């Protein structure tokens, strides 16, 4: 099993290209099931979750071809992938596939809308809280679907004549459920209005692609999305937006170690709240023609309190990384997690590096320490794993991160990107 070995103490200097967003690519790939034409996606990252979803879509009958090109020697791949689901050969998404990645559950929306039925296993993925599917079920029921849960599967059927537009207000914001309901509503009869919809950039990106396919969606990126159903969707070509979580992660890495790095092919507007928190912590951040420049020279890391919130608030997917940054601050900071009830599993691993963190409910108190010291640590989920890498970059000596398959689910060629900026990071196999 692979591990990541880090020898800390080096500043980061150079250029890091930002990959396409995993959280945008996955729903875009699933949207290909809505049409019998070809959907072409550009800037798709090479990640374990993407490969798993390719297998799942193939199970439903999608014909998939990948054209990869290496953009820079030694760095990442930006891929163009063509999806053609001319015939849906199966409306069942089995446990052995869905259990490995939560987002694969989202196929329920397109399958139900296009084929009138879907049988999808309850999902897997990162073990962060319960993450129930109730909101998905309630939203699809509002479009006329009949849904039952039996034997670990969600069985959904549409009424004769297909789904019907309706109005549904989410009792709490859900990005995944917003994706699913929006996709299903594109082929429903009549108009659907989604209230308290997720405002994340990835939702707006999905709507942009669906509209290019012939959908009629307005309001994506706001709290109210309106979808006028159409009879069918056609193919399209769409470029996946930059990964704001990867952008924020590397910005925090520079703030942690010190240095001067250009984050290329990304946009500051995708993560304004997170960038402001990093500025308050002591980094200088400016926009360039090609992306974002992050600099921290000399000044120490200042303590900053944050609260995670749905977009445009501070992203929960950057909470663990920011906690890593705060372990080296000059005072006491607090991080409150409002999205997931069990997203502090990285605390005990950061403590192995010398961090001083205490928990009270959904709030973590971080007392900055003068130095961290390398140690063996274990990744518990995707974002927690990269927080350990960031901390290891600033720790004295060697840090060895195990269970890095979590990293491979969401960060494309992380060790290569960091190494090119002067970090001592390498992948080792047992």
Swiss-Prot record:
The modification 2-(S-cysteinyl)pyruvic acid O-phosphothioketal is found at residue 126. Disulfide bonds: none annotated. UDP-N-acetyl-alpha-D-glucosamine binds at residues 102, 131-135, 172-175, 317, 339. It holds the Pfam family EPSP_synthase. It catalyses: phosphoenolpyruvate + UDP-N-acetyl-alpha-D-glucosamine = UDP-N-acetyl-3-O-(1-carboxyvinyl)-alpha-D-glucosamine + phosphate. It is found in: Cytoplasm. One of its GO terms (cellular component) is cytoplasm. GO terms for biological process: cell division; cell wall organization; peptidoglycan biosynthetic process; regulation of cell shape; UDP-N-acetylgalactosamine biosynthetic process. GO terms for molecular function: UDP-N-acetylglucosamine 1-carboxyvinyltransferase activity. Keywords: Cell cycle, Cell division, Cell shape, Cell wall biogenesis/degradation, Cytoplasm, Peptidoglycan synthesis, Pyruvate, Transferase. Pathway: Cell wall biogenesis; peptidoglycan biosynthesis. Phosphoenolpyruvate binds at residues 22-23. Its EC number is 2.5.1.7. It comes from the Bacteria. The active site is at residue 126. CDD domains: UdpNAET. Its main location: cytoplasm. Cell wall formation. Adds enolpyruvyl to UDP-N-acetylglucosamine. Belongs to the EPSP synthase family. MurA subfamily. This is UDP-N-acetylglucosamine 1-carboxyvinyltransferase. It comes from Sinorhizobium fredii (strain NBRC 101917 / NGR234). The lineage of its organism: Bacteria, Pseudomonadati, Pseudomonadota, Alphaproteobacteria, Hyphomicrobiales.
């Amino acid at each position: 099993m692979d591990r990541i070995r880090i020898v800390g103490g080096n500043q980061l200097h150079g250029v890091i290209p930002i990959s396409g967003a995993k959280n945008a690519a996955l729903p875009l790939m699933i949207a290909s099931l809505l049409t019998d034409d070809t959907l072409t996606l550009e800037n798709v990252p090479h990640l374990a979750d993407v490969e798993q979803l390719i297998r799942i879509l193939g199970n439903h009958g999608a014909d998939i071809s990948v054209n990869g090109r290496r953009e820079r020697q030694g760095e990442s791949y930006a891929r163009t992938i063509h999806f053609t689901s001319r015939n849906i050969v199966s409306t069942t998404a089995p446990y052995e596939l869905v259990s490995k990645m939560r987002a694969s559950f989202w196929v329920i929306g397109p399958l139900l809308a296009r084929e009138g039925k879907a049988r999808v296993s309850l999902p897997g993925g990162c073990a962060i809280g319960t993450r129930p599917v109730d909101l998905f079920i309630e939203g699809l029921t509002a479009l006329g679907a009949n849904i039952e849960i039996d034997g670990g599967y969600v069985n959904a059927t549409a009424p004769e004549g297909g789904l019907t537009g309706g109005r549904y207000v989410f009792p709490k914001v859900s990005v995944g459920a917003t994706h699913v309901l929006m996709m299903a509503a594109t082929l429903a009869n009549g108009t659907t209005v989604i209230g308290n919809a997720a405002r994340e950039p990835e939702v707006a990106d999905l709507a942009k692609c669906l509209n290019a396919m012939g959908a009629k969606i307005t309001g994506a990126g706001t709290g109210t999305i309106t979808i006028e159903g159409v009879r069918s969707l056609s193919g399209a070509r769409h470029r996946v937006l930059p990964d704001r979580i990867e952008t924020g992660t590397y910005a925090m890495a520079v703030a942690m170690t010190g240095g001067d790095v250009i984050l290329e092919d990304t946009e500051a507007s995708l993560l304004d709240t997170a960038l402001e928190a990093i500025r308050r912590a002591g980094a200088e951040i400016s926009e360039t023609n090609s992306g974002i420049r992050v600099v921290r020279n000399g000044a120490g890391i200042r303590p900053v309190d944050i609260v995670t919130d749905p977009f445009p608030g501070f992203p929960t997917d950057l909470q663990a990384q920011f906690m890593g940054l705060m372990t080296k601050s000059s005072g006491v900071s607090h991080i409150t997690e409002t999205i997931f009830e069990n997203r502090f599993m990285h605390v005990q691993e950061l403590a192995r590096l010398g961090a001083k963190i205490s928990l009270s409910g959904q709030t973590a108190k971080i007392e900055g320490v003068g130095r961290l010291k390398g140690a063996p640590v274990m990744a518990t989920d995707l974002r927690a794993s990269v927080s350990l890498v960031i901390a290891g970059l600033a720790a004295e000596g060697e840090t060895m991160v195990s269970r890095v398959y979590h990293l491979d689910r969401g960060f494309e060629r992380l060790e290569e990107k960091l190494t090119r900026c002067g970090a001592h990071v390498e992948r080792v196999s047992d």
